[in-house]
C-alpha cells in the first residue's frame, strides 16, 4: 500500500501461476552496487537451467562519475557479468533498457535523460547475441502519446494524504505507480 511500483512487481499479472517470477530489484541500486551487495550471488543460488534473467540498469548507473565510469566502461563490464553468470547456469539473459523519466521539452517530446546507457545496452545485446526489451523507446511512445498532463497518471503524482503517512504532495517523474508499472 504505497505509491511506488515497478514493472518487476507488476509483470506477474501477465503470466499464469505456472510461471515463477523472482524480483530481486531494489530501488536505488546500480549494476555494480547490485553485484557488490551480493544480490547477484543470492539470485544465482536460486537460478536454474532454462530460467530467464531480465537485466535492467541505467537509472542509477548514470549518476556515477569519475575515471573508468560510464556506459561503455564500468557499466558494460558489470552488465557482462550478469550475462556470463546467467549463461554459466544455463539461463537465458535478456537485457532491458531503462524506462524514461517524465521530462518533456517545449514541444511535448520526452527528453533523453539516460545519456549513452540505453545505447550501450542495445550494443551489448547485439554483441552478445541476446534479446533486448526496449522499455526506453516503449515508454517514450507511451508518454508522448498520452501527453504532458495525462502521463502524470503513470508516475507517482499524488496530492498529500493519498497514502498513509504521506503528508506532502508527491511529484515523482522517475518512478511509476501501479498503473504505470
Q: What label would you give each PLM region?
A:
Residues 1-25, 41-49:
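Serine-esterase "nucleophile elbow" of acetyl-processing enzymes
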Residues 25-28, 59:
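Short glycine-rich, polar/acidic loop-and-turn segments at beta strand-coil junctions
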Residues 29-30, 177:
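Short, structural beta-strand-to-alpha-helix junction motif
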Residues 30-38:
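Structural motif
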Residues 38-179:
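Alpha-helical cap/lid subdomain in secreted, periplasmic
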Amino acid at each position: 500500500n504505497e505509491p511506488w511500483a515497478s514493472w518487476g512487481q507488476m509483470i506477474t499479472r501477465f503470466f499464469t501461476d505456472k510461471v515463477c517470477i523472482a524480483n530481486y530489484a531494489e530501488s536505488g541500486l546500480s549494476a555494480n552496487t547490485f553485484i557488490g551487495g551480493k544480490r547477484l550471488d543470492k539470485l544465482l543460488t536460486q537460478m536454474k537451467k532454462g530460467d530467464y534473467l531480465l537485466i535492467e540498469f541505467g537509472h542509477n548507473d548514470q549518476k556515477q562519475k569519475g575515471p573508468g565510469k560510464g556506459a561503455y566502461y564500468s557499466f558494460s563490464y558489470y552488465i557482462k557479468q550478469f550475462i556470463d553468470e546467467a549463461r554459466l547456469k544455463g539461463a537465458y539473459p535478456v537485457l532491458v533498457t531503462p524506462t524514461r523519466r517524465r521530462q518533456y521539452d517545449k514541444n511535448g517530446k520526452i527528453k533523453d535523460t539516460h545519456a549513452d546507457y540505453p545505447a550501450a545496452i542495445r550494443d551489448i545485446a547485439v554483441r552478445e547475441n541476446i534479446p533486448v526489451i526496449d522499455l526506453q523507446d516503449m515508454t517514450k511512445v507511451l508518454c508522448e502519446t498520452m501527453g504532458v498532463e495525462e502521463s502524470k497518471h503513470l508516475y507517482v503524482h499524488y496530492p498529500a494524504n493519498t497514502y498513509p503517512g504521506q503528508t506532502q504532495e508527491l511529484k515523482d517523474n522517475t518512478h511509476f505507480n501501479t498503473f504505470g508499472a
